[in-house]
Amino acid sequence: MSSLSKEAELVHEALLARGLETPLRKQELDAETRKTRIQEHMTQVMQLLNLDLSDDSLADTPRRIAKMYVDEIFSGLDYENFPKITLIENKMKVDEMVTVRDITLTSTCEHHFVTIDGKATVAYIPKDSVIGLSKINRIVQFFAQRPQVQERLTQQILLALQTLLGTNNVAVSIDAVHYCVKARGIRDATSATTTTSLGGLFKSSQNTRQEFLRAVRHNG
């Protein structure tokens, strides 16, 4: 991983140490080769479904899916895509909660490869540094762009921010609809899943925790 940014390496190592990294094999193929291989296999899948790939509506679908997987919805599997992080010295000595609400995220259930659609609320109490606000959104999106389970996604975002900011005082909550529940199986179209991960004062201080949870309840 020598080509990765320092921040990407730190986050990846922290997740590995805590057993929170997405199960990954060593990457041996470049992006274009992976797209070619996925296209070939998706062609076979569609043929096994008795779809006629000579139809002009379907002919390019395997290529589109391969490109979507590698460049878009699973781009977070490659730490070369980890967002560039801007940290700013906390010269103003900010010591109150900073909260970013209504962060939209779209991920993919790793059990059925269907959509997870939701919103995240992220808060932290600055220590020596503050982070550019859009970087929080980008970190959420990076980890969402993987096959995921919501519990792990929530904890990955938390640990990434704790690692980058040098503080345990971080909290993350995600509320999401799982299409593996909505579109198949039980086919419950109205249920949603909420996961929360708390660190530092958000866990140990009832007042801090309640302040964060009030922000979560105001979501949407």
From Swiss-Prot:
InterPro entries: GTP-CH-I_C/QueF, GTP-CH-I_N, GTP_CycHdrlase_I, GTP_CycHdrlase_I_CS, GTP_CycHdrlase_I_dom. Toroid-shaped homodecamer, composed of two pentamers of five dimers. HAMAP family: FolE. It catalyses: GTP + H2O = 7,8-dihydroneopterin 3'-triphosphate + formate + H(+). This is GTP cyclohydrolase 1. Zn(2+) binds at residues 109, 112, 180. PROSITE patterns: GTP_CYCLOHYDROL_1_1, GTP_CYCLOHYDROL_1_2. GO terms for cellular component: cytoplasm. The keyword DNA damage does not apply. It comes from Yersinia enterocolitica serotype O:8 / biotype 1B (strain NCTC 13174 / 8081). Keywords: GTP-binding, Hydrolase, Metal-binding, Nucleotide-binding, One-carbon metabolism, Zinc. One of its GO terms (biological process) is one-carbon metabolic process. Gene3D superfamilies: 1.10.286.10, 3.30.1130.10. Signal peptide: none annotated. Its EC number is 3.5.4.16. Pathway: Cofactor biosynthesis; 7,8-dihydroneopterin triphosphate biosynthesis; 7,8-dihydroneopterin triphosphate from GTP: step 1/1. One of its GO terms (molecular function) is GTP binding.
